[in-house]
């Protein structure tokens, strides 16, 4: 069955396989007007020659090249590699701390403190750290340095891309958002038009509470933590950056909102609420194509979302 000039496809469904794709088109009444089997290389050419319609496909690895642009996929690849390297570095640092603590050597929390103290610790007498353990930790420290170099290189490349992208530049006008978050957001959702409002974007990130309904009551629980974990973590980090700089609250128009929220929320809950707010602001900036504009919020209306 194939499409004719008298039939317009309203909805197109694509079943994605490794080498072949099955395409089914429906008209406005739901009747099948197209059914084809295409190779992977034929799909894009076939879609390019069709009138605009609603396209549905399964969410899988094979579908990624059909939706985001090539630039988005490249940027996502940079972020994924960087995320993996950061995770590996964290694992190495935790392992070094664990080995030291097993021998009674405690180091103040924080990456820079361990980096500064490690040479002195490794020079301690053999009764504290055996020569074998010193060699083990020196090897881990070497892995740490190599990961630092790779992470720094990827971060510099991501920042360079963000500085040349108009959408990323706009997003960086939002408090707490820099090149990493802005580029990760653009890579993930493009222009943001896949969401109808900022609340939907925040929900997709998993920054909204779960709702438990019983009878006529609705109970709000912990955040759902669904969706894009990487972006969610970045927005929470952005919220903490804003919270530890109270002098910037007034400049960004967030002071009334934060001060009202502080009175009734634990600081960790406040960080999540602010991350939700920043995500919604960021979506608005991206979707509307305008820089962040400071708008003071009345204390009476400062309800964390």
What is each of the regions a protein language model found here?
Residues 1-305:
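A detector of single, family-specific signature residues
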């Amino acid at each position: 069955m194939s499409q004719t000039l008298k039939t317009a496809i309203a909805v197109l469904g694509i079943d994605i396989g490794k080498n072949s794709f099955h395409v089914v088109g429906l008209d406005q009444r739901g009747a099948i007007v197209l059914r084809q089997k295409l190779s992977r290389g034929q799909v894009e050419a076939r879609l390019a020659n069709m009138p605009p319609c609603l396209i549905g496909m399964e969410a899988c690895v094979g579908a990624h090249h059909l939706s985001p642009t090539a630039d988005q996929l490249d940027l996502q690849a940079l972020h994924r590699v960087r995320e993996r390297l950061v995770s590996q570095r964290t694992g190495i640092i935790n392992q070094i701390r664990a080995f030291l603590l097993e021998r009674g050597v405690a180091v103040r929390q924080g990456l820079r403190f361990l980096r500064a103290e490690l040479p002195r610790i490794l020079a301690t007498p053999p009764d504290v750290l055996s020569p074998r353990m010193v060699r083990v930790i020196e090897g881990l420290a070497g892995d740490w340095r190599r990961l630092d170099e790779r992470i720094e290189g990827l971060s510099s490349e991501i920042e360079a891309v963000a500085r040349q992208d108009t959408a990323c530049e706009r997003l960086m006008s939002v408090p707490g958002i820099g090149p990493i978050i802005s580029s990760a957001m653009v890579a993930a959702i493009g222009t943001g038009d896949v969401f109808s409002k900022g609340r939907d974007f925040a929900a997709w990130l998993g920054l909204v509470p779960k709702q438990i309904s019983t009878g006529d009551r609705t109970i709000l629980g912990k955040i759902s933590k669904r969706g894009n974990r990487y972006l969610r973590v970045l927005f929470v980090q952005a919220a903490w950056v804003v919270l530890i700089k109270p002098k910037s609250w007034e400049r960004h128009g967030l002071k009334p909102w934060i001060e009202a929220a502080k009175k009734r929320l634990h600081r960790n809950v406040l960080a999540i609420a602010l991350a939700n707010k920043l995500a919604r602001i960021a979506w608005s900036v991206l979707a509307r194509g305008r820089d962040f504009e400071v708008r003071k919020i009345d204390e009476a209306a400062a309800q964390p979302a």
